[in-house]
Amino acid sequence: MLPDKKIQVDFNAPDLSSNGGLVLVGLMKESIARKVARLIPDHRNQLFVQHSYEEMVCQRVGQIMCGYEDANDCDRLRHDSALKMSVGRKASDPDLCSQPTMTRLENHLDKKTLWAIAELFVKDYMSSFDKAPRKIILDVDDTNANTYGAQQLSLFNDYYDEYCYMPMVIFDGMNGKLILPLLRPGRRNKSLNIFGILRRVIEFIHKEWPHTMIELRGDSHFCSHEFMDWTRTHLYVKFTTGLSGNPVLMKKIDKQLRRAKGDFERHHADVRRYYSFEYKAKSWTYKQRVIAKIEVTDKGVNIRFIVTSNRNNKPETVYRRYCKRGTMELWIKDLKYFRADRMSCSSFKANMFRLFLYGAAYVTAYRLKSKAFSNTEVEVFTMDSFMKRIMLSAVFITEKKTFVRFSFSPHHRHLEAISQALTSLSA
């Protein structure tokens, strides 16, 4: 490195933290992590309690936001001054909790508490609006969280060729806000299960926003005939979901398909057509509007179907709006940057709580990006970039009698953005 000098390395730096982004988290006035902690009943003898549940949940979420998803990381990071201060302790205060204490918390929760936390996620999403929106879109999808042990309800999924859980996540399709993460067994959700979950979420939202139009958008796994029947008696609920192809559907578009193939052969140019027709499957109570997209290119024929309650717009308009749900894959990817597919606990309830913690990390980071870093390049960062460039910033912490100083590097790549965020959060 330097041929004329010897290199010496030690680990004796002053109070330096590599998790400087936690300073921003600590300045947030009311984080979802603190709200989650307040829902957990504490039956411990308070005379012997050293770590409150609020501190523990904030510690865990803070670690996740910095890329330390494992409870084992508590043993090292409990000494970190930035992490301490983000949960409300001074750098000179006793250390935070260790891995065994954190693991006991994860395995402590019962169904009632988990239900309350799920409701909290929806409430917190709604509180992010100044007033009831005219319309929201519920983008719903499931994703795999592979398991490698004997976790409860971990099942073999033939599609992924792995033992896994299948968490279901609901995002606001208009802005990427996380509404609810929900852990599910490792199989595809059945139609009735989907209806039961979505009905509860929509009814919960409509209690506060009775006149908000809510549209469900999902792939064919979320085509629930129970849900479609239910929407007929609920004026402010709509849906557009994928629909698996079958011989009956193919027969209905046979004429249009032959015409599209003929046009491609004559003009040697890609052909894309949209058609709308009525269809009723055997399990459906009512006929529904189905839209088919027929695409013929030199790579072959591509046919897709969707079913929708929208009877007003043109087929192409409805289909293009449905295609916007593809952005949700990026939001799921963002959630997984926080290792939201790490389900190492043996108990299903403990893993459910872990998913909520990962979700809390996503919500906190989203709020920081959209509010504290608004109109900066950081606002459009992926969660991976946000973690690496902002959360994992070096900070030197100096604690005096009357103040604490956080010193970031003067050469930080995003110095101006962090300065703006600090000003915004301190206002």
Give names to the regions the model predicted.
Residues 1-7, 11-14, 238-336, 395, ...:
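An anionic, glycine-rich sequence signature occurring as long contiguous blocks
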Residues 1-189, 193-208, 233, 369, ...:
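Dynamic "connector" segments at or just before major functional cores
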Residues 28, 74, 314-348, 353, ...:
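Short amphipathic alpha-helical "interface-anchor" segments enriched in bulky aromatics
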Residues 141, 212-222:
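Acidic/histidine-rich, metal-coordinating catalytic segments
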Residues 143-145, 185-186, 244-246, 297, ...:
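Short, glycine-/Ser/Thr-/acidic-enriched flexible segments
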Residues 149, 224-229, 250-254:
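A short acidic (Asp/Glu
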Residues 228-237:
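Short, surface-exposed basic-aromatic patches at helix termini and helix-loop junctions that form
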Residues 341-403:
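Basic, amphipathic alpha-helical segments enriched in Lys/Arg and hydrophobic/aromatic residues
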